[in-house]
Swiss-Prot record:
GO biological process, one term: cell wall organization
Protein name as catalogued: Glucomannan 4-beta-mannosyltransferase 1
Superkingdom of origin: Eukaryota
Further details from the record: Galactomannan is accumulated only in the endosperm and constitutes more than 90% of this tissue at maturity. Galactomannan is made by the combined actions of two enzymes: mannan synthase (ManS), which makes beta-1,4-linked mannan backbone, and alpha-galactosyltransferase, which adds galactosyl residues to the mannan backbone. The mannose/galactose ratio of guar galactomannan is 2. The degree of galactosyl substitution on the mannan backbone determines the quality of galactomannan as a gum. A mannose/galactose ratio of 4 provides a gum of higher quality than a ratio of 2.
Organism, as annotated: Cyamopsis tetragonoloba
Family the entry assigns: Belongs to the glycosyltransferase 2 family. Plant cellulose synthase-like A subfamily.
Gene3D superfamilies: Spore Coat Polysaccharide Biosynthesis Protein SpsA, Chain A (3.90.550.10)
InterPro entries membership: Glyco_trans_2-like, Nucleotide-diphossugar_trans
Length: 526
């Protein structure tokens, strides 16, 4: 056998393209093909794991719909309300609004919360303002004073530091002396606007069942029509609430706190050890620990709280990094604690580790990116690797349909949603790896930018000559590189292939280029 390392084989052309071709051929059989076959096997296993999980959740939802019995419907809400009104024993409720430089939306949440129809002497509004802008801090405090003059018990709290970020603010808020008499705490992010009857539709569950530690409401998106990116986000989040959260609640297994639009029993927070800032998903961290202490949760899908989706691609990327990195990091930190916990049944612990964390927070991201964006395109240019259509086409198609049925009004956007989610899987995969390895960006906390009415005001105003779009800030090299790779594979399949994968590859390459050049979402002039 010719020594490819120390001897120069005869007949090797001298130009660079021929050298690259020779190098490719020399490693193709001994290295590329075995590695690609292994990757296909691993990705196929992950696809089947995700498929089984999605089908199982779909079966639960089907049973729930057929029987018309969701977890919260076993309670008679109207009867519980009447019982509370007759007794006049209204519990003291703390309402926390954490915010950080939320100049576009701070009035929305403060105004909505102060307008809640609960006895005025039985709730405290706590505005936790970590803003670093002194002018904005003054504006927020003035807004609080306005509602104080109207008779609402509002407490404005501003820290000199941002230790612990949101978790730190919530923790310090609960330590205030005036909170000692509060039994429950409702939490709303700065862009959330609860309806006036929110407390009437959530607190009775906690009063009726002393084992309940959390009542989680659903999100309702006020700006889903703003651009195509917000419509596609709506599809993903609708699946999360209508399927993942509902299944966790209906099966008494586990579902995570969404960080906002929920009401906690303060004793449950104390039993769990309080808020911790060890990850960027302090809400999920608290929910897992409370669940391990035996507290139950209920998801009330009929209660919807208006809020805003991130409409700029930059803001959405930062949000998805936090939402993907944090769970992976928490999974690493809590696996041993979950396994060793004897207070909850073994089946619930297995569900928490395998289904909730491993499949939904790790496998779902990895299989989407590695299989659909790396391995399948590679199989096109290495036809020696057998890729079964059941794995490459039928299983992904079934998973996609199960995801999309939760938002029927957007079914016509299904293809765009697939392409969009595949591109975002690049960032989610990278973030999950960072979380597992605890790399340098593992605790990166960037508040998701919300535009509120800002874009309406900008659209109505005459654009300034000084306003410019910074092209360089809109270019994302990783997306462009993956797009070029998929375009190369698509071209090869178009010229030499026979499986017609080039149709998918061209569309997906176009999606990577579109997002790589920042041509998605709302573009805000600088």
């Amino acid at each position: 056998m010719r020594n490819l390392i120390f001897e120069e084989p005869e007949g090797i052309p001298g130009n660079s393209s021929s050298s690259l071709r020779y190098a490719w051929q020399s490693i193709r059989a001994p290295v590329i093909i075995p590695l690609l076959k292994l990757a296909v096997i691993v990705c196929s296993v992950m696809s089947i794991m995700l498929f089984v999980e999605r089908v199982a959740m779909a079966a639960v939802i089907l049973i729930v719909k057929v029987l018309r019995k969701k977890r919260y419907t076993k309670y008679n809400l109207e009867a519980m309300k009447q019982k509370l009104e007759r007794s006049k024993k209204y519990p003291m409720v703390l309402i926390q609004i954490p915010m950080y430089n939320e100049k576009e939306v701070y009035k929305l949440s403060i105004g909505a919360v102060c307008g809640l129809s609960w006895p005025a002497d039985r709730f405290i509004v706590q505005v936790l303002d970590d803003s670093t802008n002194p002018v904005l801090r003054e504006l927020v405090e003035m807004e609080c004073q306005k509602w104080i003059q109207k008779g609402v018990n509002v407490k404005y709290e501003n820290r000199r530091n941002r230790n612990g970020y949101k978790a730190g603010a919530l923790k310090e808020g609960l330590e205030k002396q005036y909170v000692e008499d509060c039994e429950f705490v409702a939490i709303f992010d700065a862009d959330f606007q609860p309806d006036a009857d929110f407390l009437w539709n959530t607190i009775p569950y906690l009063l009726e069942n002393p084992k309940l530690g959390l009542v989680q409401a659903r999100w309702k998106f006020v700006n889903s029509e703003e651009c195509m990116m917000t419509r596609l986000q709506e599809m993903s989040l609708d699946y999360h609430f209508s399927v993942e959260q509902e299944v966790g609640s209906s099966t008494y297994s586990f579902f995570g706190f969404n960080g906002t639009a929920g009401v906690w029993r303060i004793q449950a927070i104390k039993d769990a050890g309080g808020w911790k800032d060890r990850t960027t998903v302090e809400d999920m961290d608290l929910a897992v620990r409370a669940s391990l202490h035996g507290w139950e949760f209920v998801f009330v899908g009929d209660v919807k709280v208006k809020n805003e989706l991130p409409s700029t691609f930059k803001a959405y990327r930062f949000q998805q990094h936090r939402w993907s990195c944090g769970p992976a990091n928490l999974f690493k930190k809590m696996t041993k604690e979950i396994i060793c916990c004897k207070r909850v049944p073994l089946l619930k612990r297995l569900h928490l580790i395998y289904a909730f964390f491993f499949v939904r927070k790790i496998v779902a991201h990895w299989v989407t990116f590695f299989f659909y964006c790396i391995v399948i395109p590679a199989c096109v240019i290495v036809p020696e690797v057998n890729l079964k259509k059941q794995i490459a086409i039928y299983i992904p198609a079934t998973i996609t349909i199960l995801n999309a049925v939760s938002t029927p009004r957007s079914m016509h956007l299904l293809v765009l949603w697939i392409l969009f989610e595949n591109v975002m899987s690049l960032h989610r995969t990278k973030a999950a790896i960072i979380g597992l390895l605890e790399a340098n960006r593992v605790n990166e906390w960037v508040v998701t930018e919300k535009l509120g009415n800002a874009m309406k005001q900008r659209n109505n105003a005459r654009p300034s000559r000084a306003s410019r779009f910074r092209i360089i800030e809109r270019i994302h090299p990783l997306e462009i590189i993956v797009g070029m790779y998929m375009l190369h594979c698509a071209t090869y399949d178009l010229l030499f292939g026979h499986d017609h994968f080039f149709v998918y590859l061209l569309l997906q390459a176009g999606a990577f280029f579109t997002m790589g050049f920042g041509l998605v979402g709302t573009i805000v002039p600088t």
